[in-house]
Amino acid sequence: MIVLVVNSGSSSIKYQLLDMDNEKVLCKGLAERIGIPGSRIVHKKAGEKFIVEKPMPNHDEALKIVLEVLKDEKLGAIKDFKEIDAVGHRVVHGGEKFSGSVLIDDEVIKAIEEFSYLAPLHNPPNLMGIKAIMKLLPGVPNIGVFDTAFHAKMPEKAYLYAIPYEFYEKYKIRRYGFHGTSHRYVSKRTAEILGLDYNKAKIVTVHLGNGASIAAVKNGKSVDTSMGFTPLEGLVMGTRSGDLDPSIVTFLMEKEGLSAEEVYTILNKKSGVLGLSKNFSSDMRDIEDKALENDPLCRLVLDIYEYRIAKYIGAYAAAMNGVDAISFTAGVGENSPITREEICVNYLSFLGIKIDKEKNNVKGEERIISTPDSKVKVLVVPTNEELMIARDTKEIIEKGLKQLEY
């Protein structure tokens, strides 16, 4: 079965074509600068990189060009569009309705549109991608895989905010969580690597990219996660503040004469690592390099970043009444030995965690980095959201399902 995976953003579209009989990536790429001058496709096939420069005024045109590339004699991997059996789409917000991946029909599209008020930056471009593919590949089934779905069945005690209950009833203000596809892939893979029964294991997954979140996965279900109503809650991120006292918002509005929208932009785009480092960088690689050169501010930023992560891991060990494994993933999680080591050694030794320095000296590679006698296993598990989306797509098509429950 050939599956095309599409992740449609506001000005870019990531795509991957997979042969699901052997889970092999046939080719992949990124259409960037959609609707902006200088639009192009960066395409990869068999380790080779190709640049296709073409005007892409909108998502329809961008995906049309992507499909042409997939069929191209030199760049592509198929001879005819009929070879594409299904398309899997990343959709950011599924609200409370979707707790699993779904076969997309008019009703599902309507629901995604309804949830757009919860993810105004993400759901509309996700929908543009879905609608464009439906036009370009009529008759090919489309599957929606939601970032929120894995967390949708968190218990009420984990997802409700302690604000008047009517706001939950009126506006569905609650904790939703994000990065669900990544947390699901990494937790499942962790259980496989360790030979644990996924449905009986207690796993903490630590997704550290420019956006970052942690999940507590107990018996194969997400029981808590650090992001909330929006991806602003939780950890210190590249440009997001993470947890803070909400009264800071009204305080800044008053003292700086700012609108709610302006404060929101500050907390989302100008805070986190970027804000703490006095606008030096939002990239943890830059912060780490300077911290290792004994720059006091960058050392402090790294300390704050790690401290917040360690607190959440400790909290989730309590939430699950124990922990079998902790897995680091995404850009920073996969590629920063120092962050992993400092979190585990400085804060988590009380859990009986011991890190093997040599094994931890790994970047972007699947590996157990704890010692054999470590009571809790610590791993690096590179995430693979596209594969997870493709697997869900295959399962729904093969089993003739409308919705796949996790």
Swiss-Prot record:
Active site per the UniProt annotation: D147
What are the entry keywords?
ATP-binding, Cytoplasm, Kinase, Magnesium, Metal-binding, Nucleotide-binding, Transferase
Q: Which residues make up the binding site for substrate?
A: R90
The record's section on Pfam families has: Acetate_kinase
Q: What is its EC number?
A: 2.7.2.1
SUPFAM superfamilies given in the database record: Actin-like ATPase domain
Q: Does the keyword ATP-binding apply?
A: yes
For activity, the cofactor(s) needed are: Mg(2+); Mn(2+)
Q: Which GO biological process categories is it annotated with?
A: acetate metabolic process; acetyl-CoA biosynthetic process
At the top level of its lineage, which domain of life is listed?
Bacteria
Cofactor remark from the record: Mg(2+). Can also accept Mn(2+).
> What's a single GO CC term here?
cytoplasm
Signal peptide (from-to): none
Annotated site residues (Transition state stabilizer) in this chain: H179, R240
Give the reaction(s) catalysed: acetate + ATP = acetyl phosphate + ADP
Query: Cellular location of this protein?
Result: Cytoplasm
Primary residence? cytoplasm
- Cite the annotated pathway: Metabolic intermediate biosynthesis; acetyl-CoA biosynthesis; acetyl-CoA from acetate: step 1/2
Transmembrane: present as a keyword of the record? no
Annotated HAMAP family:
Acetate_kinase
What is the protein's quaternary organization?
Homodimer.
**Name this protein carries in UniProt:** Acetate kinase
Supply the source organism for this entry.
Answer: Thermosipho melanesiensis (strain DSM 12029 / CIP 104789 / BI429)
